[in-house]
């Protein structure tokens, strides 16, 4: 498979986490906790059934990997979710994430970017870039998506489908290349979607 280099032409590495510590580096990451109701977003805006917690049953580091596991305990689904809010922002560049994905009905692995001004400029006006999402019942297909506001909610999605395989079988590299004019999505360095700024009035993607 594709292994990401530390640098690309005209780019320098500015942030990385190889998960080689014994526990998650909270200078880089925050834990999302509970069901979202405390922040007025029950179900985290997606009708999610699980309860996020900071527990090694659900989220831990092992052998240089971040391992997130969904569990069912006493009738409650638990899982883990982390973010970099107030710890790191980026405007333009390339993001690579190497991951092996789970499958199963109701499973929804995802890697998202949200506008850092979301507290002042609520979603979707702040903009959202979904670097990768996969529906657990379709483990051979991932998607890249943007969400934004242009006189109303707008979304645009592209798909990448594996041939005679699925994303649970081995690690793949999911990438986003982003500049002021275009956003591009890749799987194992193969480009499968581009989204261009064609004078969109509500284009929020020139901000961190």
Where are the regions a protein language model picked out?
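GH16 jelly-roll
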Residues: 1-208
